[in-house]
Curated annotation (Swiss-Prot):
Name of the encoding gene: hemB
Binding site for Zn(2+): C119, C121, C129
Regions annotated as coiled coil: none
Active site positions: K198, K251
Keyword Zinc carried by entry: yes
CDD domains: ALAD_PBGS
Residue sites binding Mg(2+) per the record: E236
The protein's name in its UniProt record: Delta-aminolevulinic acid dehydratase
InterPro entries the UniProt entry points to: ALAD, ALAD_AS, Aldolase_TIM
Gene Ontology MF term list: porphobilinogen synthase activity; zinc ion binding
Length: 327
């Protein structure tokens, strides 16, 4: 006890502090999200997400090269199609925007890992993540018919060269359905990163501007999780593990670090944390107003995800963080 035990002894110098640091953020932890749109030479900034852009495929390739040069190992692609319909055709069509972006990136930067978001909300004309009953205005997605769309989408993305399939729609049984579809088409070696614990969160607002994916009516609470629940997250993860998930994700991250920790304690699989758009935009807005030190707050936040148990971090801060970590 004091005065014999003095924890401050190990905090006296920067070198000592670094030697005993329990969790260290590295560029290898980072995954950078990108939004692909039709056209050429397009780089349209998302108003609610300073520094984030909707990009045409040629610009996506430029970004992918920069990401690679910064040492970031992976990107995750989201698509914004020109046309939307009830069948989410743009999600699974071989000439879909994400398929084109995937092919272009893998050709130009073959060593960069391309993760593809496997969801339907950006591609449906109602903004929900699957088929709806005729006349439904509440957002109650028909689960099992939607699985058929997700299977087609995953196979199409794999055909385009995706390295990792990341289903995010929170449909019951979606991991098993996608795993079986991939295996049936000789894609046994493509891993699945499941959005296993995805909450119905208010932090997604800016993303829906970026991805043009806001529901036209109702909400997503019948398929995304209640923010008040934690045991349910463990159940979702357990089911996804049984269905064949190779990695699992918690989304959002900042307000759900207890969930990251609990999931990390229950599984040996890699756990990803999605530092979502609202979390990003709050930091950006405060920094632009001079209220916080953007670099310090960002690196502290990302390190906290590591401390909570995240092995991978999807973040719009990835490029900035990579530069800061090099300094």
């Amino acid at each position: 006890m004091f005065p014999t035990i003095r924890p401050r002894r190990l905090r006296q110098t920067d070198v000592l502090r670094r030697m005993v640091r329990e969790n260290t953020l590295t560029v290898n932890d980072l995954i950078y999200p990108l939004f692909a749109v039709p056209g050429n030479a397009i780089a349209k900034e998302v108003v609610s997400m300073p520094g984030v852009y909707q990009l045409s495929v040629d610009k996506i390739v430029d970004e992918a090269k920069e990401v690679r040069d910064l040492g970031i190992p992976a990107i995750i692609l989201f698509g914004i199609p020109e046309d939307k319909d009830t069948d989410a055709t743009g999600a699974w069509h071989d000439c879909g925007i994400v398929q084109k972006a995937t092919e272009a990136v893998k050709k130009a930067v073959p060593d960069l890992v391309v993760i593809v978001d496997t969801c339907l909300c950006e591609y449906t004309n109602h903004g929900h993540c699957g088929y709806l009953e005729t006349g439904d205005l509440t957002g109650r997605v028909l689960n099992d018919p939607t699985l058929e769309l997700l299977k087609k989408t995953a196979v199409s993305q794999a055909n385009a060269g995706a390295d990792v399939i990341a289903p995010s729609g929170m449909m019951d049984g979606f991991v098993q359905a996608i795993r079986e579809a991939l295996d049936d088409h000789d894609f046994q070696n493509i891993p699945i990163l499941s959005y296993a614990a995805k909450y119905a969160s208010a932090y997604y607002g800016p993303f829906r501007d970026a991805a043009d994916s806001s529901p036209q009516f109702g909400d997503r609470r019948t398929y995304q999780m209640d923010p008040g629940n934690s045991r349910e997250a463990l159940k979702e993860v357990e089911l996804d593990l049984l269905e064949g998930a190779d990695m699992v994700m918690v989304k959002p991250a900042l307000s759900y670090m207890d969930i990251i920790w609990r999931i990390k304690e229950m599984t040996n699989l890699p756990v990803a944390a999605y530092n979502v758009s609202g979390e990003y935009s709050m930091v950006k807005a405060a920094a632009l107003n001079g209220w916080i030190d953007e670099q310090k707050v960002t690196l502290e936040t990302l390190t906290s995800f590591k401390r909570a148990g995240a092995d991978l971090i999807l973040t719009y801060h990835a490029k900035d963080a990579a530069r800061w970590l090099q300094d």
